Swiss-Prot record:
Reactions it catalyzes: oxaloacetate = enol-oxaloacetate
Function according to Swiss-Prot or TrEMBL: Tautomerase that converts enol-oxaloacetate, a strong inhibitor of succinate dehydrogenase, to the physiological keto form of oxaloacetate.
Record's keyword terms, sorted: Isomerase, Magnesium, Metal-binding, Mitochondrion, Transit peptide
Family the entry assigns: Belongs to the FAH family.
Domain of life: Eukaryota
Protein name: Oxaloacetate tautomerase FAHD1, mitochondrial
Lineage summary: Eukaryota, Viridiplantae, Streptophyta, Embryophyta, Tracheophyta
Pfam families per the UniProt record, alphabetical: FAA_hydrolase
Record-listed E.C. numbers: 5.3.2.2
Length: 223
């Protein structure tokens, strides 16, 4: 089940829908207002990185910011889904990282430009294997954590999400159709910060899933 779900996610999923500022403490640490409705943006599926892979920092950057998140894997086509039945459209869960080139994002924001280049590059969405839906009894009661070289950087509870899982599915499906294998990243708790070349990230959902990734410089082939 988990193997087939992750295969569908990688091969059939059409998009990664991300929810920004969905934890009040994280919005505050970045100097952003707490949103009154979900802040959503997209990442390409080409940014996926399987557990054990290497996160690549592109030249000339020296670091990326880590953001650990609960990922929802959509199990069936969803359009205009009522909040009351939204959980029926989840196929599974995963732990994911929304790696962010914060310098590029800040520069784009200051110029009033989109910031896909800051979040959509190859290896910028490391993700675990898919947890079957039955393994996660209450997605509103999970602990997310992230360590860099063994030092805890992030630890937060999904109950602190501003917009809960059923609402997110209903809201997003009212804007765009979600397909089997699509992924929703539900936001990150406070504690985001830089990770540099040569460091190692471990992250997980306590008691359910754990991932690890090395961080290295991206090396392009010689032209």
């Amino acid at each position: 089940m988990a193997t087939s779900m992750i295969q569908r996610m990688f091969k059939q999923g059409t998009k990664i829908v991300c929810v920004g500022r969905n934890y009040a403490a994280h919005a505050k640490e970045l100097g952003n207002a707490v949103p009154k409705e979900p802040v959503i943006f997209l990442k390409p599926t080409s940014s996926y990185l399987e557990n054990g892979g290497t996160i690549e920092i592109p030249h000339p950057l020296d670091s990326l910011h880590h953001e650990v998140e609960l990922a929802l894997v959509i199990g069936q086509k969803a359009r205009d889904v009522p909040e009351s039945i939204a959980m029926d459209y989840i196929g599974g869960y995963a732990v994911a990282l929304d790696m962010t080139a914060r310098e590029l994002q800040a520069s784009a924001k200051a110029s009033g430009l989109p910031w896909t280049v800051a979040k959509g590059q190859d290896t910028f969405t490391p993700i675990s294997s898919v947890l079957p839906k039955a393994m996660v009894r209450d997605p509103d009661n999970l602990e997310l954590w992230l360590k860099v070289d063994g030092e805890t950087r992030q630890k937060g509870l999904t109950k602190d999400m501003i917009f809960k899982v059923p609402y997110l599915i209903s809201y997003i499906s009212s804007i765009m159709t979600l397909y089997e294998g699509d992924v929703i990243l539900t936001g990150t708790p406070e504690g985001v910060g830089p990770v540099k070349i040569g460091q190692k990230i471990t992250a997980g959902i306590t008691g359910l899933s754990e991932v690890q990734f090395d961080v290295e410089r991206r090396v392009k082939p010689l032209s």
